[in-house]
Amino acid sequence: MTSLLLNAKCLVVKVGSSLVTNNGAGLDKGAIAAWADQIARLVKSGRQVVLVSSGAVAEGMQRLGWKKRPVAINELQAAAAVGQMGLVQMYESCFASHGLHTAQILLTHADLADRKRYLNARTTLRTLLDLGVIPIINENDTVVTDEIRFGDNDTLGSLVANLIEADALVILTDQPGLYSADPRKHPDAQFIQYETAGNPALEKMAGGAGTLIGSGGMLTKILAAKRAARSGAHTVIASGREPDILVRLAQGEVVGTHLKAGQVKTLARKQWLADQLRVAGKVVVDEGAAKALREGGRSLLPIGVMAVEGSFERGEVVSCVNTAGEEIARGLVNYSALETARILRQPSHEIEHILGYIDGPELIHRDNLILV
């Protein structure tokens, strides 16, 4: 067996808070220098690397003299704003010693939800990689709200992997990888070395939140791997405490949990649709429509819609759920919530008569719809 990273040319590496801080008390320069050294070796071997690094909040807490991680979002935003300066400066200094340039990229969900901004971000990142620059990515904490935040850097890392169509996502944590149960509570827990990303059994086994310093538990990592697999990216979850972990993985050594992207790669536009973490509303579909969506790859017609939930406008992303509330698909809707409520259960030829205009016979065209 060899590492899934052996032939990977473009990597997204996510480094957790505990791996770049002194137990949450500010940044650990020695640790960051070591990460820069490993990534520099990968770049000089011909690979492209995007770094998603935690640590801004912890550094901000240190600079502000806060001992306890704040709960209020405005205080977290303030800590992140202060700490981001130190985080980027330290990475810049460490990479400069290897003759490499870095670039700071701060993203929000709104950047990736808007198709034009999404494509612009992809072009910029690809250009930076072609120039041999190391993009250092984080969430733009100072402007996000609780409703539109990524929530953790595992999620952000997977979205970036999809954005640039990376070959692999590496999630480095303070744990060796994924177990069948929490090994701290269950000594007989089995270590999972190889599995397919998206296997439902993994989500059932994954635990809750991690340390007090970070924000992501194993479940977020499993979901991140599932998301990254849509663009064909394999995921490795491994301990950042292992010496030269990135270099060893790139050389083919099997360390940590390897989650293979077993599914067929999703088309770029549909992948973007699937990556939308927030939906504007829901439409409840009947059994016939649910079957047509699942099995036939059909468009969603108004006649198959039973109810509308939420307030959405034309062109926004909505979730399609069955009568049991289970999400089947999501897509870009052709009509607003108010208009949808007027035409639901109606045949498509009645749309123009009811609304006074028609923007297509489908509520959601199959080209703008993806199964989930």
Swiss-Prot record:
Sorted UniProt keywords: Amino-acid biosynthesis, ATP-binding, Cytoplasm, Kinase, Nucleotide-binding, Proline biosynthesis, Transferase
GO molecular function list: ATP binding; glutamate 5-kinase activity; RNA binding
Domain of life of the native organism: Bacteria
Record keyword Membrane present: no
Domain PUA intervals: 280-358
PROSITE patterns: GLUTAMATE_5_KINASE, PUA
Transmembrane portions of the chain: none
Amino-acid positions noted as binding substrate in the UniProt annotation, renumbered to this chain: S54, D141, N153
Main location: cytoplasm
One GO location term (cellular component): cytosol
Example GO biological process: L-proline biosynthetic process
Similarity comment: family membership: Belongs to the glutamate 5-kinase family.
Official protein name in the record: Glutamate 5-kinase
Organism per entry: Methylobacillus flagellatus (strain ATCC 51484 / DSM 6875 / VKM B-1610 / KT)
